Amino acid sequence: MKLIIFTGLVLFAIVSLIEAQAENEKACLPQYQVCTDAPGNCCSNLVCDCYGRYKSGARIGRNCFCLQKGVIYKREN
């Protein structure tokens, strides 16, 4: 009887550890993916870079994308 209880507790502990590990290892967002709602989820070599959208001088929104760290993007005419 003690062996059955011990086995049950060990299995419960193993399942709990597996679930906790899976929750901590969320998939990161790859390059050029939208990160407006999740700025901390970009992969390690990327940063969530945000840009304001303007129309006639008034701000109408914000876009955020996972981009390479240290890279500067410029608008082309």
UniProtKB/Swiss-Prot annotation:
Assigned keywords, A-Z: Disulfide bond, Secreted, Signal, Toxin
InterPro entries xref list: Spider_toxin_CSTX_knottin
Family in the record: Belongs to the neurotoxin 19 (CSTX) family. 08 (U8-Lctx) subfamily.
Name this polypeptide is given: U8-lycotoxin-Ls1b
Keyword Secreted set for record: yes
Organism: Lycosa singoriensis
Propiece residues: 21-26
Signal peptide (residue range): 1-20
Processing after translation: Contains 4 disulfide bonds.
GO CC annotation terms, alphabetical: extracellular region
Localization (cell): Secreted
Tissue specificity as recorded in UniProt: Expressed by the venom gland.
GO molecular function, one term: toxin activity
One Pfam family here: Toxin_35
